[in-house]
Design a protein with these regions (language model features):
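Glycine-rich loop-to-alpha-helix module at the N-terminal edge of alpha/beta enzyme cores
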Residues: 60-159
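Residue-level signature of catalytic and energy-coupling elements of molecular machines
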Residues: 48, 104, 148, 182, ...
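Hydrophobic face of amphipathic alpha-helices that form TPR/SEL1-like repeat modules
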Residues: 1-69
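Conserved small-residue-rich beta-alpha loop and adjacent elements
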Residues: 161-211
Length: 211
């Protein structure tokens, strides 16, 4: 796959002007959509298989703690699922590392476009999940989009064989290679942007992750 992106196209995702009545109305609609989906249970996913543990915990809105945003499985000292996730990611790495770097970059560009299409919805989730203001949530989503665009272009920049200083009688090459499986543990205060940045940087370089 040959990407049509060029290194000089990267621009920061613009923030939403909520003083525009149309933008404010669109965001309110996104909030109502997300509100209707609150309280659902979200399973653990390993290798495409959905798993649920007996013990659960609620993720609640910090501004209104009676509001349950989502229900999640609660782990304990049993690390078997963690071991399984790492092993599964290791298996995926064997094929993912061989995907051409331009194709890996194109996946990030596609992810950025999908996030643009659902920008208000993603931001609305953060209004409930961490009680962000509209502008703070919008900035978080914009930064996540920026990470996709930035790391995709960085992969295009560094993915090919790099120049080396020639030495008489030697034949040298210099290229970056993927290393394996990484663990992504993002902070709570930027639930989309930092998670996206850590994940996209690793994945576009040919690695796999456990998130």
């Amino acid at each position: 796959m040959q990407t049509q992106r060029s290194l000089d196209e990267c621009r920061n995702e613009p923030f939403t002007d909520f003083s525009n009545p149309a933008n404010a109305a669109a965001f309110k609609a996104a909030l109502e959509k997300v509100r209707s989906e609150l309280g659902r249970e979200y399973p653990i996913v390993i290798g495409g298989e959905k798993l649920s543990l007996d013990h659960k915990f609620n993720s609640t809105d910090p501004a209104e703690k009676s509001r349950v945003v989502g229900v999640f499985s609660e782990g304990d000292t049993d690390t078997s699922l963690v071991d399984r996730a790492i092993a599964t990611a290791g298996e995926a790495f064997l094929s993912w590392r061989n995907v051409p770097y331009a194709e890996r970059a194109e996946y990030l560009f596609k992810a950025a476009e999908l996030m643009r299409q659902r920008k208000h919805e993603l931001s609305a989730w953060m209004v409930f999940e961490v009680s962000k203001t509209w502008a703070e949530a919008d900035g978080d989503t914009a930064e996540a989009i920026d990470f996709c665009e930035f790391y995709g272009r960085e992969m295009l920049r560094w993915g090919s064989e790099q120049p080396v200083t020639p030495n008489p009688g030697e034949e040298n090459t210099f290229e970056y290679i993927p290393l394996g499986v990484g663990a992504i543990i993002p902070p709570w205060n930027f639930p989309l942007a930092i998670m996206a940045g850590m994940t996209m940087a690793a994945v576009v370089a040919g690695n796999t992750v456990v998130l």
